[in-house]
Amino acid sequence: RDRLKEDSELLEEVVVVGMDKQKRNTITAAVATVKSEAITSRPVTDLTSALQGNVAGLNFASDAAADGVGGETGAEIKFNIRGVGSINGGEPYVLVDGIEQSMQNVNPADIESISVLKDASAAAVYGARAAYGVVLVTTKSGKQEKARVTYRGSVGFSSPINMPQMMSSLEWARYSNLRDESMGRSHQISDATIQKMEGFMQNPYSAEFPGIDVNQSGDGWAAADNAQYANTDWFDYYFKDRAIRHSHNISIQGGSEKTSYYVGLGYIYQEGLMDKVQDDLEKYNVNTKFSIRATDWLKFNFNNNVSLSLLKRPLANQTIFYGTIANMSPSRVTKLPVEQAEYSTPTWNEQLYLQKAGYSQN
């Protein structure tokens, strides 16, 4: 006969709730907990990504509204608990070791546990700030044990989920002429140019296409005049299929009856998906915790968390460039050898646009 044995391990689990800790079997509020093992086992570069799939009821989305970014290198991932709470959105109240700060500044390797308070009971402690839920992040501390040194490293790759499929230059030319016909205008692309485009797509290395020389006047190359020279997929040209990311973390932890300490050092590198230009993110984290028990009733805690992010990418708003690529004609060549004035920003040649517009470093 089969017998069911009671498993009380989860019932005895200690959960951080508001200003205190409680056993799970005494909690009546809706609380979800994520332990450090579930976070460090995933090759993520930020804490928000580590929550995905670990907590039910969380909805994630790239921050594409505030500053125009969405999915680019270093973009913050926004999330809400059980859906949007108001017409203006609203975000959960995030506390790291009792101090309000962004989850982007926390190294996932330093996390001890995360508690997500989902219902209105959190407002009893945090007031109106808890209207959209509360996320309590607890970082690792020293323990009464011999000094222990731990290293964790990971390597992974990022890939675009979905890239637009551009039409060929021949399709573009025919649709452009159909547009002109519907508007009662003459064709933008001549039949002779379309014949050259067909020949170029069949054999781009034919002697019929000698190439393009430098345009000394600097007035650019019109797509209609040189459409026979290219059949360019601009998304394939400017974006990579995959980008590498890796992280390295080392920590030392220990203590005695009177003192305890924890020191964590972290480095994260994330390569961007843009090609032909520098597009990457580097993050440095230092987390230190020291605890000294002077007497039975007096204890000193010294906590310090320092985060430095170095983001290098072309243009201040990368989404604008993404939209520019979508509007580029596939009949343009990838590199137009045009002499450009020192202080002029070419809007028709995106490669020069990237080079001349400068970089944004934060």
What is the meaning of each model-derived region?
Residues 1-287, 294, 299-301, 356-357:
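Short, small/polar-rich motifs associated with maturation and membrane association
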Residues 64, 155, 306-312:
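A general secondary-structure junction signal
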Residues 204-207, 217, 229-230, 307, ...:
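Acidic/polar loop-and-plug regions of large Gram-negative outer-membrane beta-barrel proteins
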